[in-house]
């Protein structure tokens, strides 16, 4: 099975300064490999203290996001696992293929509220079908990246939206890991909804596509592994000299 050279990879890493996040992809040519819609998917998240890792000399730039397990990254970062972080997930819409000018691309449904939060308008839509509006990955990526650049307003709105509509995953364990399986296929919004007491910042939200594919385009995979990162500021008690 090979769909290489048919995929333009757009990494979600650009959305949230995150490392090794699953890609949303555009398929630019017809593929004989089809998604098995009878399957479900899973999302696994690894949470690490990248500030401490970098200070200890770990070269985090050596790790490339693929959406698949990276044993080397896990081994290098295991000492910096964050326990007690809570992530929430929400299936925000369907993923469909759209043919245009002899090419096929993936398009993604987003609910009206998320469109408004990201600043997407009807003129940005790649397709409208009844009450459903679809956008390309490039549109979603660019809008989210821009909205998260300068302030926390967008992040706060997405966290609030997730608090009202999302489902919390189990808190990360001692290895910094949490996961959820048996998820219907589609586009998911992931938000960190609770940080441990000694951490002052949460990771920026990101999207995950189920199923996904990596840059090689060998096949579709239904179990996506995310390694989001952020620089933490740890709370410390003041000392009196």
What residue spans do the PLM features occupy?
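Solvent-exposed loop/turn and edge beta-strand elements of beta-rich ligand-binding domains
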Residues: 2-235, 241
């Amino acid at each position: 099975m090979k769909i290489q050279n048919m995929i333009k990879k757009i990494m979600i890493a650009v959305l949230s300064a995150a490392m090794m996040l699953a890609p949303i992809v555009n398929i630019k040519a017809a593929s004989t490999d089809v998604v098995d819609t009878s399957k479900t998917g899973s999302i696994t998240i690894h949470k690490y203290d990248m500030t401490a890792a970098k200070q200890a000399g770990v070269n985090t730039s050596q790790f490339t996001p693929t959406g698949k397990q990276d044993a080397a990254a896990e081994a290098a970062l295991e000492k910096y696992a964050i326990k007690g972080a809570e992530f929430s997930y929400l299936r925000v819409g369907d993923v469909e293929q759209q043919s245009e000018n002899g090419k096929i691309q993936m398009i993604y449904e987003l609910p009206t509220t998320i469109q408004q939060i990201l600043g997407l308008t009807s003129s940005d839509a790649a397709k409208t079908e009844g009450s459903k509006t679809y956008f390309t990955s490039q549109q979603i990526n660019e809008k989210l990246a821009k909205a998260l650049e300068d302030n926390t307003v967008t992040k706060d709105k997405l966290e609030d939206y997730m608090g009202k509509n999302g489902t919390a995953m189990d808190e990360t364990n001692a290895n910094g890991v949490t996961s959820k399986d048996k998820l219907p296929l589609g586009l998911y919004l992931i938000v960190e909804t609770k940080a441990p007491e000694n951490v002052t910042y949460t990771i920026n939200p990101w999207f995950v596509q189920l199923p996904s594919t990596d840059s090689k385009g060998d096949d579709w995979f239904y179990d996506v592994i995310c390694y989001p990162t952020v620089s933490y500021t740890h709370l410390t008690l003041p000392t009196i000299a």
